[in-house]
Amino acid sequence: MALPKLNTPTYELELPSTGEILKYRPFLVKEQKLLLIAQESGEEKQIANAMGELVNSCTFGKVNAKSAPMFDIEYLFLRIRGKSVGEKVKLNLICQDDGKTTVPYELNLEDVECQVQDDHSNEIQINEDIKIVFRYPLLND
């Protein structure tokens, strides 16, 4: 007899790059453990892979972290982390003037938004004949 599958709460958000409405869930203990192991390793690639796997799992496979723009992955990760661990993060900001003084600050992850200008385009017109089309940076770039 198989173990029962526990339901997790689901939430919706608007994907910054496409405006698509997407469902996601908080991460589970096993996924949090993957993040902790990656963090302890200190390897950038392992951290990026763990973050990508977490986003893939928590969006029910709707977002492919290998092909989605980095800003989408970061935005999703912050939203998932907020619903999983808590929306408020305590930070110690270092003063830019002396580089030593720290100021405590509490950031609400729900307030973090991806800003896109109205005239934003990934195309740059060099002259009448030449136009360059860029792609957004990816997680493993």
Where do the PLM segments sit?
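Long C-terminal interaction/binding lobes of large macromolecular proteins
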Residues: 1-141
